[in-house]
A protein has these predicted regions:
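Extended beta-solenoid/beta-helix repeat architectures
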Residues: 1-223
């Protein structure tokens, strides 16, 4: 059973909580935290699951087994999560985003590094660096859904592309991505990509609709 908070006030409890109004709390540990209203955590929080349908701001770190964001989430510190499912807008201003698995059909922005074993994105990602084992980013053209969130948050300067300085993983598949460097074993550079440099040690496929400045490494080029 969830402890439900509505209206304005300060949340001072742990456990299972649901927020429907405007609530501020100092941080703490939760089993499950659901945000349907406007919620601000003044400190770091730990939760088994964090479900955001409203607007959530954390002024510290966030650590959870599961993050499900259908609303707008801003994290001033670091984000550590086993699985993140992002259909809304999530912005992380700390040094690092760490996850086992990230699924992004919305918008994910990170001020610095995203580190995840698996990243599957049909939305948009903006970060300085992404490292992992398997990275799939298929960002291509704006939709009405994304445009709405981008107007609210201005999460990306160019919403037609995901923009990452460095992408490094064993397996990489990209579409609609701008990157300075892409390093990996097996790489697919799809249409609407603009990549300055690709370092590939396995197989490499480059779509005719992509722009790649330089290719280095021992890659086997395939069509």
């Amino acid at each position: 059973m969830y402890t439900k908070f509505a209206g304005s006030g300060t949340l001072k409890t742990a456990g299972r909580s649901s927020i429907d109004g405007v609530v501020t709390f100092p941080g703490g540990k939760f089993d499950d935290l659901k945000v349907n209203g406007v919620c601000t955590s003044e400190g770091s929080i730990e939760a088994v699951s964090l479900d955001i349908d409203g607007v959530f701001t954390a002024k510290g770190d966030v650590c959870a087994e599961k993050l499900d964001c259908d609303g707008v989430t801003t994290i001033e510190g670091n984000l550590r999560v086993k699985k993140a499912d992002i259909d809304g807008v999530t912005s992380v201003h700390g040094d690092k985003v760490e996850a086992d698995h990230i699924v992004c059909d919305g918008v994910l922005t990170a001020a610095n590094q995203i580190s995840a074993d698996i990243i599957e994105a049909d939305g948009f990602i903006n970060a300085k660096e992404i490292v992992g084992d398997r990275i799939v980013i298929r960002s291509f053209r704006k939709s009405t859904f994304f445009s709405l969130f981008l107007k609210i948050k201005q999460a990306l300067k160019d919403p037609d592309f995901s923009k990452i300085d460095l992408i490094e993983a064993t397996t990489i598949e990209l579409r609609g991505v701008r990157a300075k460097a892409v390093n990996g074993q097996d790489i697919i550079i799809g249409p609407a990509c603009i990549i300055d440099r690709v370092d590939c040690s396995g197989t490499l496929a480059i779509d005719p609709g992509a722009q790649v400045g330089e290719v280095v490494g021992s890659a086997q080029i395939r069509s």
